[in-house]
Amino acid sequence: MIEELAREIVKRFPRNHKETDPFRVLISTVLSQRTRDENTEKASKKLFEVYRTPQELAKAKPEDLYDLIKESGMYRQKAERIVEISRILVEKYGGRVPDSLEELLKLPGVGRKTANIVLWVGFKKPALAVDTHVHRISNRLGWVKTRTPEETEEALKKLLPEDLWGPINGSMVEFGRRICKPQNPLCEECFLKNHCEFYRRRGKGEVRNRTER
């Protein structure tokens, strides 16, 4: 049943990735941290118009990037990370992005979510990226009972076939923004309400507020 529901989410909320080059996926994902998609796209476009390769970015100073990526927020920190990542890629990996989770996690500012997105979008490897949306929705539906995104990732890998690991992230993000919102979720409009533990608990008065997981 969980697999069927997951496929329905992917079907209703398809997410197409405009960029698939591993380096650009990596840098864009770093820029996407704590900001909206439209801000990420604007910042990425401006950045890659000036700096097209790891080699070019490795020679830059963080302050050279400020105006280009300002729209992404936290631009000073992100600029430092992007330059440092680029230098490491050039010095240690010959200008290539590593295609293993272990190596990606060694890069500054790269956590499991970012690494898994790079593996899936950039290398088409089965990888399951879990952000706050995926973590929240999976728990609300009752698919998992976990406390952290890391625990959710491991639990979902056991529940879903590999072909769903990649697509489920982007689709759940859209589902979480439109329907299963962090606050005031649109439960009555949701196509999954008859299969949702959170909805059943609300009906029984067990959920005290609309923000509870």
From Swiss-Prot:
GO terms for biological process: base-excision repair, AP site formation; nucleotide-excision repair. Binds 1 [4Fe-4S] cluster. Residues 101-120 form the HhH domain. Its cofactor is [4Fe-4S] cluster. Gene3D superfamilies: Helix-hairpin-Helix base-excision DNA repair enzymes (C-terminal) (1.10.1670.10), Hypothetical protein, domain 2 (1.10.340.30). Pfam families: EndIII_4Fe-2S, HHH, HhH-GPD. Keywords: 4Fe-4S, DNA damage, DNA repair, DNA-binding, Glycosidase, Hydrolase, Iron, Iron-sulfur, Lyase, Metal-binding. [4Fe-4S] cluster binds at residues 180, 187, 190, 196. Disulfide bonds: none annotated. InterPro entries: DNA_glycosylase, Endonuclease-III-like_CS2, Endonuclease3_FeS-loop_motif, Endouclease-III_FeS-bd_BS, HhH-GPD_domain, HhH_base_excis_C, HhH_motif, Nth. Its EC number is 4.2.99.18. Transmembrane segments: none annotated. PROSITE patterns: ENDONUCLEASE_III_1, ENDONUCLEASE_III_2. It catalyses: 2'-deoxyribonucleotide-(2'-deoxyribose 5'-phosphate)-2'-deoxyribonucleotide-DNA = a 3'-end 2'-deoxyribonucleotide-(2,3-dehydro-2,3-deoxyribose 5'-phosphate)-DNA + a 5'-end 5'-phospho-2'-deoxyribonucleoside-DNA + H(+). GO terms for molecular function: 4 iron, 4 sulfur cluster binding; class I DNA-(apurinic or apyrimidinic site) endonuclease activity; DNA binding; DNA-(apurinic or apyrimidinic site) endonuclease activity; metal ion binding; oxidized pyrimidine nucleobase lesion DNA N-glycosylase activity. DNA repair enzyme that has both DNA N-glycosylase activity and AP-lyase activity. The DNA N-glycosylase activity releases various damaged pyrimidines from DNA by cleaving the N-glycosidic bond, leaving an AP (apurinic/apyrimidinic) site. The AP-lyase activity cleaves the phosphodiester bond 3' to the AP site by a beta-elimination, leaving a 3'-terminal unsaturated sugar and a product with a terminal 5'-phosphate. Belongs to the Nth/MutY family. This is Endonuclease III. It comes from Thermotoga maritima (strain ATCC 43589 / DSM 3109 / JCM 10099 / NBRC 100826 / MSB8). The lineage of its organism: Bacteria, Thermotogati, Thermotogota, Thermotogae, Thermotogales. The gene is nth.
